Amino acid sequence: MSTFDNAIADRPIGLTAPSGIDRAAHHRLDEAWLAAAWSHPTTRVFVVSGGQVLIDDTAEGGTEIVMTPAFEAPITETHRYFLGTDEDGVSYFALQKDSLPGRMDQPARPAGLREAGLLLGPRDAGLMAHAVALENWQRLHRFCSRCGERTVIAAAGHIRRCPACGAEHYPRTDPAVIMLVTDEKDRALLGRQVHWPEGRFSTLAGFVEPGESIEQSVAREVFEEAGVTVGEVEYVASQPWPFPSSLMLGFMARATSSEINVDGEEIEEARWFSREDLTAAFESGEILPPYGISIAARLIELWYGKPLPKPGSIG
């Protein structure tokens, strides 16, 4: 298999492009520095709630997260997360709250990461992904896995510490492989999960299991879901996927067999597509492409040779 010259880095989407933010982890335990940063007039803060933030589609530079000066934002009974600093020295924080604030003085609307990740620039998309991932982790890991006692937030949102036994718990990231498989005829293997809308096809994917390399995981997942064996595996790119805590590792893989036998549990249907087959299926509305924010769309585009149609623009 040849190396792809038009790598994802050449056409990054919001969650794969460099954000320009230095996460500055060395400041997370420095309470004096955090307090000074919070009171600095350039520091900006936004609210995250239920995986959503407020965005402004009318901003001069394009869609942006609605942020306010940190010193104007009350922090009582909220979780405050330090997200990092930019090249100009501006610090960014997120506040986790039960609901998003009302904004009557400017255009704003709530949006989740699947939508906002396509609209926001790299800086704001990266900040939102960081904040949403921390919010999900905080929500799901409130108790100590060692002794069962309630934990408290530390390190500006990046540690949960157990006062009872002293254990420290860190945000988890679950590695998952996602791969576009091609055969000797250069056809692409796409599948449809049981719970997806009718006609939605995408790449195969699955979690890496304990004691397994990512290459082994690619081969296992493809065989389990579609009954196809693979040989050569080529890493392409990664993407954070905080729904709630995955890191998607993107691959191209070459099949060594072509007979499909779906598992019927995760994958309901799988098919080989030539580029001509896929174009015809898109144009007829038979097939719906994966959502644009997903690295799946970029993997398919690397093989397809051009952008996929946007969902809702076909059929």
Task: For each feature predicted by the language model, list its residue ranges.
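The catalytic Nudix box helix
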Residues: S202-A237, F251, S257-E259
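Nudix hydrolase/Nudix homology domain
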Residues: M1-H141, V152, W196-F201, D263-G315
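Short Pro/Gly-enriched beta-strand edge/turn motifs at strand-loop
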Residues: G62-M67, R160-A164, V233
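Non-heme Fe(II)/2-oxoglutarate
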Residues: L247-A270
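Cys/His-rich short segments
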Residues: H130-L180
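N-terminal strand-loop-strand
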Residues: R160-S202, F207, T229-V230, A253
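Acidic pyrophosphate-coordinating catalytic loop
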Residues: A167-Y170, Q239-S246
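Conserved hydrophobic/aromatic beta-strand scaffold that supports enzyme active sites
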Residues: F82, F143, I178-L180, L190, ...
